[in-house]
Amino acid sequence: MTLSSNQYQLPLNVRPYTTTWCSQSPSCSNLLAIGHDTGITIYCASEEQTPGSTGLTLQELFTIQTGLPTLHLSFSSSCSYSENLHDGDGNVNSSPVYSLFLACVCQDNTVRLIITKNETIITQHVLGGKSGHHNFVNDIDIADVYSADNRLAEQVIASVGDDCTLIIWRLTDEGPILAGYPLSSPGISVQFRPSNPNQLIVGERNGNIRIFDWTLNLSAEENSQTELVKNPWLLTLNTLPLVNTCHSSGIASSLANVRWIGSDGSGILAMCKSGAWLRWNLFANNDYNEISDSTMKLGPKNLLPNVQGISLFPSLLGACPHPRYMDYFATAHSQHGLIQLINTYEKDSNSIPIQLGMPIVDFCWHQDGSHLAIATEGSVLLTRLMGFTRL
């Protein structure tokens, strides 16, 4: 499988900071969000109409005005799409209506939950101030928690920042409930586990990778102010002794990001800024006796990665695992505008990178696994991946 030069490019008249697909919502999986200097612009991907083409194109739908640069974004799985709704006068509205739930980070270091009907903001929770982060916020993710009768009980937002803190923001009917968890260095990435929203993976700049269950200490969180609480981490890994055995550079072990891999989060992929990457399989050979899904307790032999390697270039943007094939991930060199596809289980599988000729800001996979959205300083591109079939 290789990246193709078959690309669709859409010029932007804003400065982008981040991009993400609405991949968790079945009805909105073709929506792409660009966070930029004045807000969030939503695009819809559709099949290209050119005869013989199998690519996607983008159509701008609307812009949600936040009034500040939007630096990080995450869609809730509660996002939905509907048609032929009636307005207040009983008339049929033929325009599509997107009900969106977006967690975002703005330049003032606030974390926000924005609920919209198309571009109209219905509700906006601004979470910050004295009870929020006291420095730059580096990543954010959102998860929906359902009750026993399959109703949405609350939405949970996780954020990490340069203040060496992970904050869990629970949005309930009674208002936001916050809890802070100290880290040993600045937090650079955070992600809920796909198969269990109670569990989080957190990456720290010093190479620490931590997993914990945020529900284990709820009694300490039942207050309206952020309080640093002691929560038992389920698992801690560290890239420092692993990558320094083959790299002497001081930046070798500085983590770029860490992500779950597999649709159930059965593995971990960590990318260092030097280009070194490491992969852990939490459930090797489906032997669930080696590790408990609920407690994440590992034996000593599991602390070492199952496989590791290095990309063709350093990466400040980290790794983006393929949504369907857990052996593959994409990485990028932001300054030189390079995108590379790597197979973790094929030795020397480094593919020839695509050179875009412009700095890369962010990139992410479409849920179908055949297209990569790439935000550059002046445009957004959809690059088709040759060799992967679409769903």
UniProtKB/Swiss-Prot annotation:
GO cellular component, one term: nuclear pore
InterPro entries named in the record: NUP37, WD40/YVTN_repeat-like_dom_sf, WD40_repeat_dom_sf, WD40_rpt
Protein's organism: Schizosaccharomyces pombe (strain 972 / ATCC 24843)
Name of the featured protein: Uncharacterized WD repeat-containing protein C4F10.18
GO biological process: nucleocytoplasmic transport
Domain of life: Eukaryota
SUPFAM superfamilies from the UniProt entry: WD40 repeat-like
Keyword NAD: no
Pfam families given in the database record: WD40
Main location: cytoplasm
The keyword Cytoplasm is annotated on this UniProt entry: yes
Record's keyword terms, sorted: Cytoplasm, Nucleus, Repeat, WD repeat
Mapped WD repeat ranges: 137-179, 182-222
Compartmental location: Cytoplasm; Nucleus
Matches recorded under PANTHER family: NUCLEOPORIN NUP37 (PTHR22806:SF0), NUCLEOPORIN NUP37 P37 -RELATED (PTHR22806)
SMART domains found in the cross-reference section: WD40
